[in-house]
């Protein structure tokens, strides 16, 4: 195995370990803003996937997103009994949005931001952070609506009509904070890690 392939393997494994910890230890996977803003608890695992995709490229980013999806599916089936677990028991909902985060963010960075100056790249990284939050949220909502409708899901608390509006109402408040968090985190962390990775020969 070449030295460069070893570097990619080590960094990929490192990001997978981070995501495993974020899934297993809840306070590592979200920012608990509830003490400041009631009900706000933005998830940040999608930004780990986004940063991995920025550093390692779309293919490995999609793989790491798929790993998060696998953990999500496992968690949904191992701890049933809530609407959240019911949503992610559908493998399409668990996998597709997470894979798309890695794929789209990795492709976008390599195509439009890889060789840009610091200022432009900072703005672009912030945009990609917000986009990662949107891809994950919109994907989960749409696939949940499709899954619940096709399977005619009947569960306490799930309405029989206007399922899309109900789901949007649930996620929209948190989504605002996730987008803001993504803009800040991905821009800040990306600007630190991208130059380090590039000096080490890691260029997507």
Curated annotation (Swiss-Prot):
InterPro entries: ECF_trnsprt_substrate-spec. The keyword ATP-binding does not apply. One of its GO terms (molecular function) is transmembrane transporter activity. The chain crosses the membrane at residues 18-38, 39-59, 63-83, 86-106, 123-143, 176-196. Keywords: Cell membrane, Membrane, Transmembrane, Transmembrane helix, Transport. In E.coli forms a stable energy-coupling factor (ECF) transporter complex probably composed of a membrane-embedded substrate-binding protein (S component), two ATP-binding proteins (A components) and a transmembrane protein (T component). Probable pantothenate-binding protein that interacts with the energy-coupling factor (ECF) ABC-transporter complex. Unlike classic ABC transporters this ECF transporter provides the energy necessary to transport a number of different substrates. The substrates themselves are bound by transmembrane, not extracytoplasmic soluble proteins and transport it into cells. Upon coexpression with its energy-coupling factor (ECF) ABC-transporter complex EcfA1A2T in E.coli allows pantothenate uptake; uptake requires both PanT and EcfA1A2T. This is Pantothenate transporter PanT. It comes from Leuconostoc mesenteroides subsp. mesenteroides (strain ATCC 8293 / DSM 20343 / BCRC 11652 / CCM 1803 / JCM 6124 / NCDO 523 / NBRC 100496 / NCIMB 8023 / NCTC 12954 / NRRL B-1118 / 37Y).
């Amino acid at each position: 195995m070449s030295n460069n392939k070893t570097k990619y393997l080590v960094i990929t494994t490192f990001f997978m370990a981070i995501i495993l910890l974020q899934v297993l230890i809840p306070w590592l996977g979200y920012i608990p803003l509830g003490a400041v803003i009631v009900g706000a608890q933005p998830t940040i695992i999608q930004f780990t996937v986004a940063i991995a995709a920025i550093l390692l490229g779309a293919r490995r980013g999609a793989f790491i997103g798929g790993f998060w999806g696998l953990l999500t599916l496992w968690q949904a089936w191992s701890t049933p009994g809530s609407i959240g677990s019911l949503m992610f028991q559908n493998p399409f909902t668990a996998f597709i949005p997470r894979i798309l985060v890695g794929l789209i963010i990795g492709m976008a960075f390599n195509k439009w931001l890889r060789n840009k100056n610091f200022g432009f790249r900072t703005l672009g990284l912030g945009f990609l952070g917000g986009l990662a939050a949107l891809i994950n949220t919109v994907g989960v909502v749409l696939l949940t609506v499709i899954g619940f409708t096709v399977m005619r899901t009947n569960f306490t608390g799930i309405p029989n009509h206007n399922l899309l509006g109900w789901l949007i109402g649930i996620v929209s408040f948190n989504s605002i904070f996730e987008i803001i968090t993504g803009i800040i985190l991905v821009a800040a962390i990306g600007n630190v890690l991208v130059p380090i990775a590039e000096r080490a020969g890691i260029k997507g």
